[in-house]
Amino acid sequence: MIASLIRSRRRSRRCVVYSVFLFGFLALWGSFALALVFLSDMYIGEDQISTQKAIKPIARSNYHVVVGHYNGNLPEDKKRNLTSEELNANLYAPHDDWGEGGAGVSHLTPEQQKLADSTFAVNQFNLLVSDGISVRRSLPEIRKPSCRNMTYPDNLPTTSVIIVYHNEAYSTLLRTVWSVIDRSPKELLKEIILVDDFSDREFLRYPTLDTTLKPLPTDIKIIRSKERVGLIRARMMGAQEAQGDVLTFLDSHCECTKGWLEPLLTRIKLNRKAVPCPVIDIINDNTFQYQKGIEMFRGGFNWNLQFRWYGMPTAMAKQHLLDPTGPIESPTMAGGLFSINRNYFEELGEYDPGMDIWGGENLEMSFRIWQCGGRVEILPCSHVGHVFRKSSPHDFPGKSSGKVLNTNLLRVAEVWMDDWKHYFYKIAPQAHRMRSSIDVSERVELRKKLNCKSFKWYLQNVFQDHFLPTPLDRFGRMTSSSNSSVCLAWTLRSSGIKTASTADCLKIFHKTQLWLYTGDRRIRTDEHLCLSVVQLLHTTSDWKIQLKECAGFDTEYWDFKPKIGRFQNRKTGLCLASPDIFDPTKDEFNPPIVQKCRSSNDRQNWTITEMSWLPEHP
């Protein structure tokens, strides 16, 4: 009996410890989203062909980079010193130990470093290092133990893996192909379809590449476009030739890890309208170190309709802790890596054929999937690495990148965003000016045919933590009563961090001076940011304004007294004020402050000048 009592007390203590841990975790989640990485299993095991290597989780600050393909024109100064011989050279010559186990290569000789620097612009990554790493290099076991122990149903659907490339490096393209072959069950891999978007590198042309791929132990098809068509149309070319039950799209500079495919196909077997994406791990563009990605972020978008990664809402994070292998609902997908039932892809309307080259197709497909009865998900048990480049080596043939992107995003807004398209046009007037020349009637008819839901439904049910204006919000500029020409603003520092500031009010509709005072009493702006306060020292008075990702902390909530225009922070009881001295010529950003509320201090009084983003109706 005594032993039983001791065991009972031990269990009780464990429960208390766990409860305290869970409470503390949830309290810190919003500000420290990266802490979730450490709660994931950080043990890096070995797959069947690798040596164990330590891999650091990728930093959140590096994770806003979009999985991209055709991001803009290669500057002339980068093209100038690249000879035809350099562009067409295939210098693949692997070293025995380079990159094994996902390790990075950083210790180059002076001669190697000089060559690496001179050829970096060819593909906007370290070509010398990539060419020195085996196309069948080993990778560590990335998955957490609960994922490794999972079993999957029999008779999973087969997949066609579609990889589009344009002037891709030989080593990264072959490494992508081999990783698919080596780490996919043979019975599930129907074929690999390579779509050449009019490459002009000799080693990618017929018959050189065809001869290289012919001995590989899987069915590989190469489709070559006779002109440059861009990612969107090239993917549709591949989809039209596919024979697998499922289409799996990958970029041409990826590495699949062990167990990457089964979770994707299982999810589609269970729900044919699910569109699952793997967790995207990071392959460093300089060292090619394989770094584990963050499993607790999901896709969103900012006011410019640019894809972004944002932390899960607290309630979702809490739920995910209870089932860390379960799918994560994502409002949008990055677009480079995902699987979709082939018949469902066709029923849903494939890609929008009116979109050109690259840009916005991931948002268009995400909105369409969600609004028309499907779901976009990220699967924590599926990991695929991707080389994240800081810029693109490719161009938009015969067109400016701005015009292509604005045209594509206009199509997204016109077809899927209903009233909120007008808000996008306010933020991107250059897109609005093209509106009369773009015909989206066929896609509008598709939306009607599929009986799709409204964008309001999408915001209320899918992207509930969005930061677009709604009728419940007060939206516009916040001006200081002490100086009506001074506006609350945010400023992008050289470090890439956005900070709260005050600035001369602009006469134009500019997102850096636009704020939402929401129905739940938060002051929000673009990029999922909230005006908050942070305590610098452990005193009751030393508080500072902070612009941070919204997380639902009580430091983010402000009670507004409209008669006097005062914002009082709920956590501290302090009032928002413009700086003591406003000097727009200073290098500093004239940050707002919080201080003890005083009725005589007009710097604590603010006026919300509401701005209309909807068109006026007669």
UniProtKB/Swiss-Prot annotation:
Task: List the GO cellular component terms.
Answer: Golgi apparatus; Golgi membrane
Mapped to this chain, the residue ranges on the Cytoplasmic side of the membrane are 1-16
Biochemical pathway: Protein modification; protein glycosylation
**Which residue ranges are assigned to the Lumenal compartment in the record's topology?**
40-618
Domain Ricin B-type lectin positions = 474-609
Tell me which InterPro entries the record gives.
GalNAc-T, Glyco_trans_2-like, Nucleotide-diphossugar_trans, Ricin_B-like_lectins, Ricin_B_lectin
Residue span of region Catalytic subdomain A: 156-267
Query: What is its subcellular localisation?
Result: Golgi apparatus membrane
Q: Where does Mn(2+) bind?
A: D251, H253, H386
From the record, give the cysteines joined by S-S bonds.
C147-C381, C372-C452, C487-C505, C530-C550, C575-C597
Q: So what EC number does this one have?
A: 2.4.1.-
Q: Which residue ranges does UniProt annotate as crossing the membrane? A: 17-39
Principal place of residence: Golgi
**Cofactor(s) required for function per UniProt:** Mn(2+)
Q: Where is this region: Catalytic subdomain B?
A: 327-389
Q: Sugar-bearing residues?
A: N81, N149, N483, N605
Q: Which GO terms describe its biological process?
A: protein O-linked glycosylation
Q: How does the protein associate with the membrane?
A: Single-pass type II membrane protein
Q: Which UniProt keywords apply?
A: Disulfide bond, Glycoprotein, Glycosyltransferase, Golgi apparatus, Lectin, Manganese, Membrane, Metal-binding, Signal-anchor, Transferase, Transmembrane, Transmembrane helix
Q: What CDD domains does the annotation carry?
A: beta-trefoil_Ricin_Pgant3-like, pp-GalNAc-T
User: What does the UniProt function comment say about this protein?
Assistant: Probable glycopeptide transferase involved in O-linked oligosaccharide biosynthesis. Glycopeptide transferases catalyze the transfer of an N-acetyl-D-galactosamine residue to an already glycosylated peptide. In contrast to other members of the family, it does not act as a peptide transferase that transfers GalNAc onto serine or threonine residue on peptides that have been tested. Some peptide transferase activity is however not excluded, considering that its appropriate peptide substrate may remain unidentified.
Domain comment quoted from the record = There are two conserved domains in the glycosyltransferase region: the N-terminal domain (domain A, also called GT1 motif), which is probably involved in manganese coordination and substrate binding and the C-terminal domain (domain B, also called Gal/GalNAc-T motif), which is probably involved in catalytic reaction and UDP-Gal binding. The ricin B-type lectin domain binds to GalNAc and contributes to the glycopeptide specificity.
Q: What is stated as this protein's family in its record? A: Belongs to the glycosyltransferase 2 family. GalNAc-T subfamily.
Q: What is this protein called?
A: Probable N-acetylgalactosaminyltransferase 6
- What is the originating organism of this protein? Caenorhabditis elegans
Taxonomic placement: Eukaryota, Metazoa, Ecdysozoa, Nematoda, Chromadorea
